[in-house]
Regions:
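Classical Sec-dependent N-terminal signal peptides that target proteins to the secretory pathway
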Residues: 12-16
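N-terminal signal peptide c-region/cleavage motif recognized by signal peptidases
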Residues: 18-21
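Flexible loop/hinge segments at secondary-structure junctions
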Residues: 24-498
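General helical structural elements
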Residues: 8-11, 203
Length: 498
């Protein structure tokens, strides 16, 4: 994916500050021929997947041809994965870097509601998974057909905005339409493949990406069907770091704890519950065992603010993800040893659910990363302690009323000593990271299209090349991008080895 210097120079010269004038519009999509791909699954790597797709497009990342890329965002963000909503779409004409897709107009629908397991869930429903615990939603939404979004009153009826997206160190303008809240719901059963047409990429997802491999989710959710019934999965050999994010009042309290223990300077707790000292030198630490105490179903009942140094009887909010979330799977493994310690020796703990809430320990279950961040901000506004797990691709941009949360050290190791929020994970000092898995639907029931399979393969191969926050290649990937010293070798339950 790396561009030669001559290509970089040419790209910069051609770009200037002009907008993306050749954006692939809804009318051009409707005119066809158009290839459709639908990805679902993890919310954490949304931006990484988007940028990997963009790196395969004409006119981007040093590729030849005209830049006609554009994106449709459900919300008001700047690009997928950045306050964009749980459903987005993006499109472009593929370059020779995309192999068999070269020259094709491709629309990618990307849905991240519900988290990682929704890469597999539609296919489980279509394959007749019994679903005794109700974890399979049975339906999924995506942005409505892009070809329709240029009509009157639709989000792409007017002129597109633009976002400058950096690919391989060069900034490229990509056309953007916001507030594309026109969505369509597809339903999955043993007799219905999304809709009557049953088309991969439009009626049902072709596959997607998960924070952890299928077997982890299968055990966590008591799923009966094996992966071979659905398709195939490959280890991307790309690591993704996670961190514990807390509300400002809890951040200040943890600073007070560390100041009292002589770990932080005496001035580090001079801030307030609405404006703590957020300088790196004053970042406080949270012992992992305290997170375990509130995340564990069997101990959450005795938790209140005093666990973290606050007043007895005060409220603590555990802002966790829904069971199908890969981030929740990562949290379960790191703090509860579930499902990794479910063998004969036992030791795994059950995660606390919303139904386990008490008057002083309130557990909520969020369907996306954005929900966690919003709940942490709400807790700050209510002067309450709150904590949850968020992937390290996220960075708060606080205002007086929004995004008021921050990452803390875990067992005195910071997850974000560097701007890219991954240095300690890559070095091996910070071990809260796991490797992404790529799933492609197969078999005779709900297979991906050949074009989608090719795209998923291409994206999986380039994820490690992107210089993105919280994301890094492992040595097994053989990537030219930022690379860690250790690897889990595609097994989340295996300790990283160097």
């Amino acid at each position: 994916m790396k561009m030669k210097l001559s290509k970089i120079a040419l790209a910069i010269a051609a770009l200037g500050t002009a907008p993306a004038a050749f954006a692939l519009t809804p009318a051009q999509v409707a005119a066809g021929p158009t290839t459709y791909v639908w990805l679902s699954g993890a919310s954490a790597p949304t931006n990484a997947v988007f940028r990997s797709v963009m790196s395969l497009c004409n006119g981007l990342a040093g590729n030849g041809g005209a830049n006609d890329a554009h994106m449709y965002l459900e919300s008001s963000g700047t690009e997928p994965g950045k306050s964009s909503g749980d459903r987005v779409a993006y499109a472009c004409t593929m370059s020779s870097a995309a192999g068999a897709l070269a020259g094709k107009k491709v629309v990618v629908y990307h849905t991240v509601e519900g988290g990682s397991f929704n890469a597999y869930a539609p296919h489980l429903s279509m394959a007749g998974e019994p679903n005794p615990n109700g974890y399979l939603p049975g339906n999924l939404k995506r942005i409505n057909d892009v070809a329709l979004l240029g009509g009157g009153g639709k989000c792409a009826a007017g002129a597109a905005g633009s976002t400058n997206v950096t690919l391989n160190g060069v900034s490229y303008p990509i056309a953007r339409y916001n507030n594309c809240s026109d969505t369509v719901t597809k339903t999955f059963t043993a007799s219905l493949k999304g809709d009557a047409a049953g088309r991969p990429g439009q009626s049902y997802p072709d596959g997607g990406f998960s924070d952890t491999e299928y077997l982890i989710n299968k055990q966590n959710l008591d799923i009966a069907l094996n992966l071979s019934s659905l398709g195939e999965e490959v280890a991307t050999n790309v690591g993704q770091a996670f961190g514990v994010a807390v509300s400002y009042p809890l951040y200040l309290q943890l600073q007070k704890n560390d100041v009292a223990a002589g770990i932080l300077a005496a001035t580090c707790d001079d801030g307030s519950p609405t404006a703590p000292n957020l300088t790196p030198a004053c970042q406080p630490s949270l012992p992992a065992q305290r997170y375990t105490a509130i995340a564990n179903r069997d101990s959450v009942g005795g938790v209140d603010g005093s666990l973290f140094g606050g007043p007895a009887g005060s409220i603590v909010n555990l802002v966790r993800r829904v069971p199908t979330s890969g981030t929740q799977s990562a949290s379960n493994m790191r703090f509860l040893s579930k499902p990794c310690s479910t063998g004969l020796s036992q030791g795994a703990l059950e995660p606390a659910r919303a139904t386990d809430s008490t008057a002083t320990a309130i557990v909520s279950e969020q369907s996306s990363t954005g929900g966690v961040k919003s709940a942490l901000n709400t807790a700050t506004g209510a002067s309450q302690f709150a904590l949850g797990v968020v992937s390290m691709e996220n960075t708060p941009a606080p205002t007086a009323t929004t995004d008021r949360w921050a990452f803390v050290k875990l067992d005195r190791v910071s997850p974000n000593t560097d701007a890219q929020q991954r240095a300690e994970a890559m070095e091996g000092s910070y071990n809260f990271w796991y490797e992404l898995a790529a799933f492609t639907a197969g078999g005779s029931i709900s297979p991906a299209s050949s074009s989608a399979a090719a795209l998923i393969t291409a994206v999986a191969a380039t994820l490690g090349e992107s210089d993105l926050k919280g994301i890094f290649a492992t040595p097994v990937a053989g990537s030219s991008g930022p690379t860690s010293k250790g690897a889990r070798l595609g097994n989340s339950c295996q300790p990283a080895v160097q």
